[in-house]
Regions:
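Cytosol/matrix-facing amphipathic helices and coiled-coil assembly/linker segments
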Residues: 1-16, 71-153
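Structural signature of hydrophobic alpha-helical transmembrane segments
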Residues: 173-185
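Juxtamembrane boundary at the C-terminal end of a transmembrane helix
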Residues: 221-231
Length: 231
């Protein structure tokens, strides 16, 4: 009779969740800080909006480029390691089997059973067995550079749109408090949601994200105000 594993572990979603949260958080903080900094320097309303729009595009493209390069490098490294394993298997299959069995012994399996497991796994897919258990490379989660780039860019754009739309809607006289308030609210919601999905404290998650967002906005607004007086 088949046994189904019904548990849904949070680690299964932590990868995409972390990327989405980081992207949206970066979009909110960077764009809100830019808008507040330019507004504090006494720029015109249209100038503030243009700066925010430029920040959204620049942030999304920067994140997309960074993710693409990072994940592509990971994919290149994994391919090189798998190619090296394939050469090792061709040169010394017995030695590679003993190496794989040693990994299982280190995990607590009886040596004789570990050797049998290694033998059967290598008979089924020798390269896959070594890639998974020796190198930690999973065929279920291959690196996808384009997907990672688009996901990160989208998350940044969605996050950045919140303070930007606020800056577009509210009048210039109320821009700074409204943008700051809306951005901090969304940061708190984002931090709390991510903490809840990851099984952590919602309050701590919300406070952590909000604190660093508020700090970034305050510093940028202060710098903008300073240069606004000097210029």
């Amino acid at each position: 009779m088949a046994i189904f594993h019904r548990e849904q572990h949070r680690m299964q979603r932590i990868g995409w969740l972390r990327a989405a949260v980081l992207g949206a958080n970066d979009g909110i903080v960077s764009t809100a800080s830019l808008v507040l900094g330019v507004a504090a320097a006494h720029a015109t309303h249209s100038g503030v909006v243009i700066a925010g729009a430029a920040g959204l595009v620049a942030g999304a493209m920067s994140m997309a480029a960074g993710e693409y390069v990072s994940v592509s490098s990971q994919a290149d490294t994994e391919r090189a390691d798998v190619a090296l394993e394939r050469k090792g298997l061709s040169a010394d299959k017995k030695g590679e089997m003993e190496e794989l069995a040693g990994i299982y012994v280190g995990r607590g399996i009886d040596p004789a059973l570990a050797m049998e497991v290694a033998r059967q796994l290598m008979a089924h897919d020798s390269v896959g067995a070594h890639a998974r258990d020796e190198l930690g490379i999973s065929a279920l989660l291959p690196p996808r550079p384009i997907q990672a780039a688009l996901t990160s860019a989208g998350a940044v754009a969605v996050g950045a749109a919140m303070p930007l739309l606020t800056a577009v809607i509210v009048p210039a006289a109320s821009l700074i408090p409204f943008v700051a308030g809306v951005s901090l609210l969304f940061l708190a919601l984002l931090g709390g949601l991510a903490a809840h999905a990851g099984g952590a404290s919602v309050t701590k998650g919300a406070l952590r994200v909000t604190f660093w967002g508020a700090l970034a906005m305050a510093v940028t607004a202060g710098v903008g105000a300073l240069f606004g007086r000097v210029a």
